[in-house]
Amino acid sequence: MNMFFRLTALAGLLAIAGQTFAVEDITRADQIPVLKEETQHATVSERVTSRFTRSHYRQFDLDQAFSAKIFDRYLNLLDYSHNVLLASDVEQFAKKKTELGDELRSGKLDVFYDLYNLAQKRRFERYQYALSVLEKPMDFTGNDTYNLDRSKAPWPKNEAELNALWDSKVKFDELSLKLAGKTDKEIRETLTRRYKFAIRRLAQTNSEDVFSLAMTAFAREIDPHTNYLSPRNTEQFNTEMSLSLEGIGAVLQMDDDYTVINSMVAGGPAAKSKAISVGDKIVGVGQTGKPMVDVIGWRLDDVVALIKGPKGSKVRLEILPAGKGTKTRTVTLTRERIRLEDRAVKMSVKTVGKEKVGVLDIPGFYVG
């Protein structure tokens, strides 16, 4: 069960989301959802665990020692830089690390969900603190250092240590923008927008995110090339393998709260319309006979799911053209089957001295 996937949102499309329509800021911890396991996850956990333990080429025992390794990997996936959780948080859950094998077999993933929810709460607190640091005068006169890779560093012992880490992080972010030629006002505006967006993303997480992370930690502990694919990622994987999909032929990306056209597939509906340009923002999506849905602040994968559809069907996009002071317009596109030619193997012949050399360019592996 050796799997892989690349996260590129292909909306028949292909995908990447920010301007400034009204999107509610998250200012309280109780606005962050407390995520719980959904019914189907118990069944999937039992089946995945059974498949891994019985059929994986690498034989292993899902015992207490292996359970502890899964816990450590999950913990580091949650807080890779060790700058969100406290040492006491880690110690609290470490007492249950040997129980994860039993949870995976039974499908009752309480430790995974409880730890994820705590990390969400702590992350909210950190970005709120970072916003408060931005209100202070910038000072680059000290001889400070900032450790970019804290993956091997111990977790902070208390809030004071955690605050010190984030003081350094904010200063590093400020200095990076300063060196890029930004004014103090522009720096504060940019970082305020960045940190608030990170907080809003916390409110967009769902139960599948937790489950996928738990299964990924389990799979990668067995073998670094083994992965769990959620239903959405399975669809993405199949698209990558077939080099085709049905949609509008646009590569999208997230920019703050907005879904932005990053590029377009030549000959696809978006490019042929000549009504959409790179840099335009998609602020609304409407299906035939249904009202336009405001997608500002949505997760990218949710916007992609709304835009994709069967060949021959129509989708309406409310487009905010790139640039300041522009008004939105509605563009109707007919979805088509898109061939991802740029990802196919290409052959060329190059002359080297008196010899000719054949060169194969293989962007990725696929079927067909």
Please report, for each region that a protein language model flagged, where it lies by residue.
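Cleavable N-terminal signal peptides
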Residues: 9-11, 20-21
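PDZ/PDZ-like domain segments forming the peptide/carboxylate-binding groove
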Residues: 76-77, 98, 112, 117-128, ...
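Boundary at the C-terminal end of the N-terminal hydrophobic targeting segment
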Residues: 20-22, 29, 189, 205
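Cleft-lining beta-strand/loop regions that shape enzyme active-site pockets
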Residues: 22, 36-37, 53-62, 200-207, ...
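Acidic/histidine-rich, surface-exposed loop or edge segments in extracytoplasmic proteins
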Residues: 24-34, 45-57, 95-99, 193-197, ...
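Bacterial N-terminal signal peptides that target proteins for export
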Residues: 1-8
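N-terminal-proximal low-complexity accessory segments that begin disordered
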Residues: 37-79, 89
